[in-house]
Amino acid sequence: MATSDIVKNYNKVEIITLKYYNSYDLLFAFGGKIMAKHRAAWNCRRYHKLVNEGRGLGIGSDYKPWITIHDLASKGVVSRVLGRTTGRIHHLLSKNETAFFYILDASEKAIDIREQFPLLPVTETVEIAERLGIRHPRDPVSRYPYVMTTDFVITTSQGNVARSVKLSLELEKTWVQEKLEIERAYWEKRDIEWRIVTEKEIDYQKARNLEWVYRSWCYPQMLPDGILAGEVADSFLDLFEKTSLPITEIARETERTFGLEPGLGLTTFQYLLLQKQIPAVNLSVPLDLVSVRLELGKGGSVSWIETYV
């Protein structure tokens, strides 16, 4: 999908102020919020309603997740994030899912990312549970079986892989282990690699940096009329490659040259990172924007993530 098409979707994203949340110091933006509402009743009628809506179907920009942030009675952090891989809004149901998504979305290996992927038909997961002697999750009132989901199904050039994101402490709970065992059996039958990802495998510093970079999606629309994003970006990149000036100084010079509002110079840097026009920045460490760069063309030391998929 072209960048211009992706940027058009940006207005659909609800931006909020960053807040501190637990020990991770970050509530990821782009729609992140703490949800607390009543869950819709789950029964046969609700199931067929979601099926008729096309939930869990489609690929790329046409995919519809089985669960959206509007469906859950969650008290955790949920997010809506515009993805660069698919050009659509992704529904992420925890801060760990959001962090992991940023890492997946930045990977050159990812061709498609489908979150909240339903394990259908539901009769199959019920049969798996019965075979394993495990209780299948059901609504406590209607007793209708819940449709189980896998957090992410990622398409690569080698095929699909499935990933479930869980806190390591959750893995000690019997009911969590049972649900994961059903998942494992479901994907094993399809000969698709399935793995569990915990907070121990997620590079949170890289996710934070990527979240910061992603704020520049609508950069072309931020510029004054008559000023082209490509022209400003080329000017910034020229200074970046030919001088050892700190990023902040290049940003200020860019603002002076084009008469931009304060802050847009730094947004130009973010935009260049988003477009992967600055290849040598290590996103696994805090970005140094104020020091003199020792090597021309180096931003410090973006390596784009090639793990987990």
Per-range role (PLM):
Residues A2-V309:
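Electrostatic, structured charged patches in enzyme active sites and in nucleic-acid/phosphate-binding
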